[in-house]
Amino acid sequence: MYILVWKRGQQIKTFHTLDEAANFKAASNIDEAQMFSITVAPAISASGGSNEATNLRRLMYLSKSTNPEECNPQFLAEMARVATLRNREIGVSGFLMYSSPFFFQVIEGTDEDLDFLFAKISADPRHERCIVLANGPCTGRMYGDWHMKDSHIDSITTHPAMKTILYQIARSFSSMWSYLPKSAGNMLLLGKDPAAQPPEPMSVVVTFIYLVEFGSILSNPNLTEQAAEVLSTFVDVCVKNVEGSGGNIAKFITGICMAYWPINRTEDALNAIQQISEDLAQLRSQQAPGSAISLMYSQAGVHYGRAMLCNAGSRKSDFTLLGDCINTTSRIATLAKKLKTPLLFSFEVRCLLGDEMREEVEGAGMHQVKGRDKPVVVYQFPGPELDVEMVRQKIEHFTPGRFRCQMPVVEYESLPISQRPPIFDDTPKGKPRPRTPGYGGRQRSDSLVDRLIMIAKLAGPSISATGDSTLTTLTYISQATRPMSRLDLSAIMRTATRRNAQLSITGTLLYVNGLFVQTLEGPKDAMVNLYLKIRQDPRHTDVVTVHMAPIQERAYPAEWTLTSATEEMLATFPPLQDVLSQLAKSFTSLETYVPSTVVRYLTAGNNPRNLMPVSCGVVMLATDICSFTSLTEKSSLTEVWMICNTFIDACTSAICQEGGEVIKLIGDCVTAYFPGNGADSAVAAAQELFTFCRQLREAFVDVLDVRGCVSCGVGLDYGQVVMAQCGSLGLTEYVVAGAVSARVMEVESITREVGYAIVITEPVADRLSPQLRDHGIIPTPQAIEGLPCYGIAGEEFELDVDSIKRGIKALHAARSGEKPLALEPEEAKQDYRVSPGRMRHGDSGRRSNSAQGKRSTQVR
């Protein structure tokens, strides 16, 4: 073991290897520090012997067999025999269970023994996709007598529930793994829950890599069919070079790759970004005539600073980097477009380069960027310019001819209903959903519940006579709100048996360590109605659907009706409860990071790899925190995380409650989409979000807290998007991309100029209900790409950016002990000025006429 000591002995951190200590020292930019090598002797128990339990660790993993056909009981018995002989020699105990096609294994022993053994296990060609479910210290051996005992599922139990449930949870878990953010995946590999990890400050080199003029590609109707293939190629090129140079992909954002490296990999980062440009150039030269890949160019900005690796959000989560340096990096990447350079980096990055590379760079001047008071000094490598205008001209004059891509995009409405991917929230809109006070409640949103509610409503009261009688199975997991006794379980069984016999529903219910796992099977509509009632039962929470699909025949005989399989089954194989419990917990955690469309498609019994690229019209929403850079530049990283977490939870709650789908969480920015006919719902979500921010400020009005200065602007626009999954090199992204994706960000940005918190474009206004369209919007003097814009009327939805900025300055001044700055005469006048585009109460106006000569209507 190695100890790193700095700050005159005030800061101490331990490491298992010397390399870990050195990397931490370099990444943390610690100059004056000393490293010591120490040996830890095992503790002595009260009986005078060595207490091995003080140095034990337990590791559980899931993997998939590469050849399930050969995994018969004899094959597994031989595997277990060899493992037992080997593991006894090194003092490792545990168990191995196989439920086709998945292996479940737990090993326990010392750190050194487990690291050695698991490295060999991971390299074994008999399995793949080795995913750690749990990994941590333990107080003693739980499986000391097992020693890798063969545990084929058929040898443990003939109960079909075990086989079905283990397969369904393991299959869903394994399929969702590739959609995880890399940082969250690394946490799970260490046996940690990403959502439970505290924020981790770090020094990083951050980049934003742009696919040049990707919006123009999406806007060109001749290239829409190839958009998914272009994105998939971009994802693969970025993943190969970033991860191959020691970096990490943070996220992909509609033709943008955000990545980061430790500071001792700065030169590797710049080389990787240059290699991405070279790889795209090589791909362009190899394409057949008509291929849109020949239009792919990259442009990047790089910056260095302190950031925080943390989990943001709860209902939908993102494990990402937060910090002021992220915003600055984005501004530098935008500046690269203006300076016509493929790679632009800041002075801070230049300082991290070695002498040899530093001599190659040349200055690109000092420039003022949005959100920063001081200008930034930037540098570039000498080389040919990248003229964005030239790329745009190539795209506009490009014709694909007879070229046909490998991933064609299909119009969503042209597909049969049964083949359409579940891209929308199908919750019926007949009755307004109740508004619940607060955000981020404990009850989770279920992956399939919205679709199930719709089915139940369509079924009506006479489901047994006229409803869908397709034989269907559904499996869900949930957490008990309190420990369940035998009497509690007996009461559940009596009620379930009586109720389900009338509906011809069979199944099984498992209760393991506070976890319910239930499988239901029966006529589809009857089962769906029953499931919706089960969800409301106060005896459990966090209800999540794992699997739902039609079946040919029942797995559970009618005479069982509903069978409780608890102690009888688990007594034959005690480790089974650990496997079930850990799988369920990991699945529940994983589901929040994966796009809702993928989760719904997967839990409906489909392979996510079969998701078809589609295009459709949607109402796009974009929102972010006003003056975020000013608010956070003098705040601690923990406060930045707190602000973003609070805001993201509010956004996801409002959006999901109104039937929208969250696309991306980008620091303080959230993007989402609603169905084309969901304009009113999108406006309602925006109003709910802005109201939350106002109530948050009021709650902290008398406290020096950064949350007392949080406000937001919301932009809404309508347009065509392409929805497709991209990537094949171990990282998969489900992308929602279109020209509207970039345009809605511009719509959101003008909220500060026109004085309205919510701004919509003409296409959205045309899709509003008559009442809201004719009496709830006010024209603004601003237009985006020729589209007139409107603000949502109402005094409660006015946005005073000057007041917000003064509040932020006053907060920072008060916290630093300074006197608040006096208002300049011009600023004082602005307090009484009506913001551009805002109408005084009592004034009347009319909606502006669009280019098509649309209606004009009286508004307040």
UniProtKB/Swiss-Prot annotation:
Gene Ontology biological-process annotations: cAMP biosynthetic process
InterPro entries per the UniProt record, alphabetical: A/G_cyclase (IPR001054), Acylphosphatase-like_dom_sf (IPR036046), Adenylyl/Guanylyl_Cyclase_3/4 (IPR050697), BLUF_domain (IPR007024), Nucleotide_cyclase (IPR029787)
Function: Acts as a photoreceptor for the step-up photophobic response.
Keyword list, A-Z: ATP-binding, cAMP biosynthesis, Cell projection, Chromophore, Cilium, FAD, Flagellum, Flavoprotein, Lyase, Nucleotide-binding, Photoreceptor protein, Receptor, Repeat, Sensory transduction
Region of interest: Disordered: 420-443, 819-860
Catalytic activity line of the entry: ATP = 3',5'-cyclic AMP + diphosphate
Composition-biased stretches (Polar residues): 847-860
SUPFAM superfamilies tied to this protein: Acylphosphatase/BLUF domain-like, Nucleotide cyclase
Name of this protein: Photoactivated adenylate cyclase subunit beta
Required co-factors: FAD
Enzyme Commission number, as recorded: 4.6.1.1
Domain BLUF: 56-149, 471-563
Cellular component aspect of the GO annotation: motile cilium
Enzyme class label: lyase
SMART domains: BLUF
